[in-house]
Structures are given as structure tokens and as C-alpha cells.
Amino acid sequence: MGAKKAAAADRPRLRNLRGEGDRLRGEIIDAAIKVLAALGPEDPFSLRSVAKEAKIAAPSVYIHFSDRNVLLLAVLEKLFGEQIAIRAAAEAAAAKAGGGAWERLLARSIVSVLFGLKNPGHYKVLFEGRVVPRLNDPRIADFGRPLMVRSIELIRQIQTISGARRVSEDPQRLALLLWSSLHGIISLQINKPTLEWPKAVELAEQIARAIIRPERA
């Protein structure tokens, strides 16, 4: 029985019916994400490895993606889109509970940390992998820009409530400090799991409070 299942898993999938090209494209992107998430620091990434994961012939990948970089861009666009949706949902939940700008910013911060810790492979593709940074395409910055823009907007709202506006409290600078610190939580806990870390939610809130200082609002 196990041999039959293994053989079925290795067997190339049937060709999608006409009109299902978009679905196949999405499946190729999902396969690429799985391959990238499992790669070691020095492991190569190829379209053939993606085709194998998707259980399709390699030429089928080229129908939708002319080369590796085009596929990598599609991967980043999807993953950043998911990040935008996840953080927006967390913010909406905080707002529904009566939270103001600080509570919404904190909710976004916490969910980003929890996602990274629960999905280290995906997180590394976005922020730590060696394959993606070799891409030199301005669209990569565009994919993730809404995340930073929203953080800046919420920080500005917090500052408006408090009336505190000093050069050292530039919203963009604070947003970058917050992002860098949250990234540190995720990266260090992924790469140094044997250390006795505080709970991720508590650590994220403590760092966010130290940077944003919402008590002044």
C-alpha cells in the first residue's frame, strides 16, 4: 500500500483542462514557495525543482514563467500580498474591539511576529533568503511598500494624539526602527531556538512600546 502511494506521488500530474491555465500558474507559484522555503543557505533553486514539486513537466513551467527571476517575482508578489492581508485583518479586529491607532499598530506588529515564527520558511523567503536578494527589480520594493506606509500612518496618528513632534520622532524613522526590531525577534528566535526567549507576544509589545511610547498619546 505504501509503495502504491509513493508511486502515485511521484507520477506526473494530468494536464490541466483548457481554460485552467491560471490555476496551473497559481499551483506553480505555490510549488516554488514550498521549494524556496525548504532550501538551505547554499542550495540552488531551479525551475526544474519547481516542476518536480508541482508534478508537471519542466516545459509547462516555461509556458507561464520565461525564467527563474520572473517566477521569483511572482512568488514575492503573492507572499507580500498575504502579509498585507494578514496585518489588515489583525488591525480590523483590533479596531472592532475598540482599539485606537496604538492598539491597531500593536496588533499588526504582533501578528507579523507570530506569522514569522510559525512560518519560518516563508519568512526567510521574504527577508532572509539568498536567492531572492539577488533580484534587482524595483517592483520588489513596491510589493512590500503598503506595509511600511500603513505603519507610518498609524504612528503619525499616535503622534497627533499626543502632540509630540520632535525630529527624533520622525514617523518613517520610527517605523523603520519598529520593523528592524520585530525582524530581530523573528530572526533570532528562528536561528537561536535554544535560548530562553520571553513569550513572543510579550516581547513584541515591550519593544513596540519602547520605540513608539504610546503612553504619551
Enumerate the predicted regions with their spans.
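Hydrophobic/aromatic-rich alpha-helical bundle segments in the mid-to-C-terminal region
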Residues: 134-141, 145, 158-209
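Helix-turn-helix
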Residues: 27, 38-70, 74
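N-terminal intrinsically disordered/low-complexity leader segments
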Residues: 1-23, 34, 91-94, 217
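Amphipathic alpha-helical linker/stalk segments
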Residues: 78-107, 138-141, 149, 157
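Short secondary-structure transition hinges
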Residues: 114-153, 194
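Hydrophobic alpha-helical connector segments
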Residues: 88-121, 171-178
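Generic hydrophobic, amphipathic alpha-helix propensity
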Residues: 24-33, 50, 75-83, 151
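Short amphipathic alpha-helical elements of helix-turn-helix/winged-helix folds
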Residues: 31-38, 115
